[in-house]
Amino acid sequence: NVISNVTHHSPSYFGYCHWFDLKDVVAWSLPSFNQNILGILEMQRCYLNTQSQKNLVLNQASEVFNKGTIAKLDDILTPHHLGVKEQDIVEPNKSTDKLIVFNHRPDTYKDFGNFMKVLEDIRQQRQDFTVWIPLLEKSDKSWITTEKFNKQRYYKKLQQCRVGFSPKQVYGGWSVSTTDGIMNGCPYIMYDADYYQELNPTADFFSENSTAINLLNKYLDDKDYRNQMSVKSQQYLKENLIYKDEIKKMSDYINDLIKQQKHIQSDVTEKLISIIKLKGQVTKKELFGSYLGWGRGINFGPYRRALLRNKNIYDTIDSTPHYCWIE
C-alpha cells in the first residue's frame, strides 16, 4: 500500500512465507492468517516450503475466500524446497555409534511426546543405544544426551549417528533438521506423510509406532543396511535438492518477471531524458513536480524502466533519490 499510495512506482511483487497462522497450529487469540493471505494476493508469486503446506493454506483460506480468489491464490503459492549446498554433502561414516538423533524442536507440533513413547518401548527391549536431542534443554534420563555445539561440531556429531527420526508434524513444513542429517550421512526414518515424501521418497516410512520401533531396531542392528540407506538418501539429495539448482529456478522466474514489465518510449520519455541530460542530476521530486507537474496518481514505473534502459542514466541510491546523467 505504501509504495502504491505514496510513490510513483508500480513494481511486480514476489515473496516467501515460512510461517502461516494455521488454526490447527497456533494457540494465540488473534491469528493473522487472513491478513497474510490478503497481502499474498497482491503478489505475482509467493514461495512456501512444501506442497503439503500449500494444501493446508488453501484449505483454510477456502473457509473465508470465494472460489475465484482461491484459484488465484493457488496460482500464486509455489513450493520452494530448501536445498543444501553440494559441498556440504560429506562421505557417509560407515562406523557409526548406536546413536539415534532427534534434532527437531522437542514440541507438541513435532510429536515429541510420541517419539519419547517409542523410545521407552524400545528401552524395554534393549539398552544398548543412546539418544541425542540437541534442542532439548535437559533430560533426567542417562541414555539421552542434549549436547549443544556450534555448526561444524553439530555436523560432526550427526556424522556419528546411526539413524535419525523425522516425526509427524502438524504444520507440514520443510525439515531442515532432516536434510542436515542426510547431507552428513545420517539416514532418517520418516513419518509417512506427503511433506516427507517431497523431501526424500527413498527413505523408510512409518505410520504406526510398531513400524517405527521395528525400523529403529533394524538400523541399530544392521549396519550394512543402514549404510546403504545413507548412500541412497544422499544420492536423492544430490539429484534433487541442491541449493544452487533451487535458487536458479527462482532466479529464472525473476528474470521472466522483469521481462514482463512494460516500458514506455514516447514524447514524454524523450522530454524526461532531455531534462536529465541538461541538468546532469535531477531529484525525482523535481522531475515529477517542477518539470512535469505530475501527481502521485500517475504510474511512473513504465517511464522509469525506459529511462534506465538509457546507457547514460542512473538511478542513485541516496537519502534523496536522483536520476543522474553520466557520459
Where do the PLM segments sit?
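A short, active-site helix/loop in glycosyltransferases that binds the activated sugar's phosphate group
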Residues: G39-D74
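Short beta-strand->alpha-helix junction loop in the catalytic core
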Residues: S52-Q53, A71-I89, E137-K138
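A charged, aromatic-enriched C-terminal amphipathic alpha-helix characteristic of glycosyltransferases
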Residues: D224-N255, K259-I264
